[in-house]
Amino acid sequence: MVGGETVKILIHACPQRMWYVEEFLAPGLEAQGAENVEIWNDTEGKGNLISCMESFAARQGYGGTWHIQDDILPCRDFVQRCREYESDGVVYGFCCEQFQDDPQRSGRVKVEDCWHSFQCVRIPDEYARDCAEWFAHRGWARSTLPELSILRGKREGDDTFFREYLQLEHRNEHVTNAKPNLVEHVDWIVGGSVLHQWRGYLARASWWDDEELILDLKEAVKGKVQYVV
């Protein structure tokens, strides 16, 4: 691990949650010292999978980018912790048991033991570009994970496809599962998929204990929530 690196952050957003991204999420990251925060807004409504792959294809250079969703809350030292992981390849910053993650598999792990959740993940830009190409030309036909028979034509899963890409193309490598988690999933506060018919539970981080930060956010966004999927 190294310190002092410039942290690149890409927020994956939908138009209905841009109020949270622009008023809270992006400014909060900048207040922590983030110098390179981009927003990838799915203005055409292509869905999380296609929008994600397009953002992967657009990555440049050979560093890494932290990809975060528009319904997360970063920890108080998020940017500093990201700097500490800047030489660690793929880093998963969020774990959720309801999303089939094993919270006990933390630290440096084999690709097969990586967490699944895509709320916060550092991806080398070279991997992102390669994954986008893999998805476009080979990934759909070669998909073997059981979930994909459900995903085709139904729910989209950028996290599932990226995990399969790692398992097929980088199976002998290791990734990092960051404990404590770097973000909390707050769709139940800012509006999101918590009330969607397919999920009726709170998908919260397994390793998060800053409830004061959660309460502060709830108070700050009171009366501002505009969207529930």
Can you name each region flagged by the protein language model?
Residues 2-68, 72-229:
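Peripheral/terminal regions associated with large enzymatic or DNA-binding modules
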